Amino acid sequence: MRTEIVEIYSDATNAAVLRHPGRHFPGVLVQGDSLYALCRQADEACEAARGVLDEDAYDELNALRNALWSYLTHYKVVLGEHEIPLPFSEC
């Protein structure tokens, strides 16, 4: 872990906008529990869309779901490395 100064443009709950040093454009900070909820929602959307959407559309939806889960997996690994408990239950 390191500490750096970031520019905070908005600290809205679950949608903080900040710029990390070295980045040209700001990004959005999504809290871990919100990211987990988005992953679960994407799972449900894929389940509901299977057999309903055409193959290309389903593949795009599934790619979105996989990208979200990839972010969540990275988040969980980093928190684990720093012995920080997850802000959600995976039960």
Predicted regions and their residues:
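Generic structural motif
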Residues: 23, 35, 89-91
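Short N-terminal "domain-start" leader segments
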Residues: 1-9
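Short aromatic-glycine-(Arg/Gly/Cys) micro-motifs in beta-strand/loop hairpins
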Residues: 10-24
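A short, charged, amphipathic alpha-helix used as a generic interaction element across diverse proteins
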Residues: 34-47
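Short, charged, surface-exposed hinge/linker loops at domain edges
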Residues: 46-91
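A broad, low-specificity signal marking well-ordered, structured residues that form hydrophobic/aromatic
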Residues: 6, 16, 28
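A short, exposed loop/beta-hairpin motif centered on an aromatic-Gly-Thr core
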Residues: 25-33
